[in-house]
Structures are given as C-alpha cells and as structure tokens.
Amino acid sequence: MGVARREERLRALAEEMRRSSPDSGYRVCDLSDVAAFVDLLERVEEEHDRVDVLLNIAGVGGVIRTEPVTAESFRAVMEVNFVAPYAGMLTVLPGMRRRRFGAIANMSSDDARAPGPGAGDYSASKAALSAATESLSYDVRPDGVFLHVVYPGWVPTEMGLAAVSDGGLRMPPRAVRRTEEQVSSLVLRRLGDPRLEINAAALPLVAPIMRTVVPSAYQWMRAKQ
C-alpha cells in the first residue's frame, strides 16, 4: 500500500507494484495532516487485518536556508519529518506487538548526525526521528518487532536534486551518492534485522568521530560546505 500526497505518481507506483503483488493499492494523504495519516493507517489495518511493515519515507526540507527559520516553518518541517512518522509507528505497533511480528523503517539523514549550516530545521527533525526510533526499538524488540533508522547518503530524488540545483548545497562526493534502487534494495534486505541502523554509505559515519577528535577542523570544513 503506497501513501503519498500526489495521486498521479501514486497511481504509477501502484501499477509497478502490482507486477509482483497484484493486490497492491494506494491512498492519497498529505503527511502534514498527522490526524489524517493516523486515520488512514487505522483504516488500512482494519481492512487488511494487519500491518506487518511500515516504511516512513516522506520528508520535506533539506535545502540551505538564507533567511531566518520561523517557528511556523520549523513546526511544519517537524510535523512531516518527525511527528507524522512517529505517530504512524504508535498506530501500528500495538498490532505488531500482539502478533509478535513486524518491522518499521524510518528514513533519516546524515544531517541528523552531522548537521551543517542553514538547515537546522531539517537536521533537527531527522535527529528527533532517529533518537525516538532508537529509544522505542528497545521497548518493542522483546515482542519480535524491529525498528530501523535508514541513512541513505545522498540520493537523486526530487528533493535531493533541488537541494543541489537551487537549494544551496554542493554536490556531495561520489562516495556518499546512492541511487533509489540501491537504497531500497538495502532496506528490503535489512528489514527485520536486529541491527538498528541501515547505512547506505560508510563515509558519513566518519563525521561524528571527526567532530569529537578534531572539532576545529571539522567545524571549518562543515562551514565551507
């Protein structure tokens, strides 16, 4: 079941999914409306008797801001990137725990672990999602439910391309670039794995270490990006 706000793209996605899963479908929902997203998940679970896998991929932001972030814009980013996926988890987890089976993957960002200039709202929202997912994973793992935080590297999605074309971000090095197919294949392989993190690229793992070991050099490099 695909969920997104643009029906035309959802329709195309559903057609592709039906090639391998004939019963695939879609629902239109804007995740900025958290209550509507929760209601949708409840209806899907009621209609299909269960939700075994939830992939929270939707996101907004990721561009370098030149103007000050307002409380309203910060809240809007947090609603889509953190509140909606967290509410989605809380909606489907009771059923997963009763059945002692389930997996949830939440799309984070390397900016959550190593935030750069001009994107504090995006980085904060992804950091909140990563932290909340890890904390909750300890509670549900004994019930056979596994939660994952996905760090995809840089992917040429619409949002990723916008960030480098007019969003103020330099093209990331080749070592951290990944395709949508590479990331999705990795996530599918790792769903249900005991490991919390799903890292598509190894290089970003060095950033938090550099920040601790050589903080001055690290901050200088981040400020230049």
Regions found by a protein language model. Name each.
Residues 1-12:
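Conserved glycine-rich Rossmann-like NAD(P)H-binding loop of the short-chain dehydrogenase/reductase
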Residues 57-62:
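Conserved NAD(P)H cofactor-binding loop of Rossmann-fold oxidoreductase domains
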Residues 89, 125:
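Active-site helix of classical SDR
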Residues 65-66, 70-75:
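Substrate-binding pocket helix/loop in short-chain dehydrogenase/reductase
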Residues 28-39, 71:
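The beta1-alpha1 cofactor-binding region of Rossmann-like NAD(H)/NADP(H)-dependent oxidoreductases
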Residues 109:
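Residue(s) in the substrate-gating loop at a strand-loop-helix junction
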Residues 149, 170-207:
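C-terminal helical subdomain
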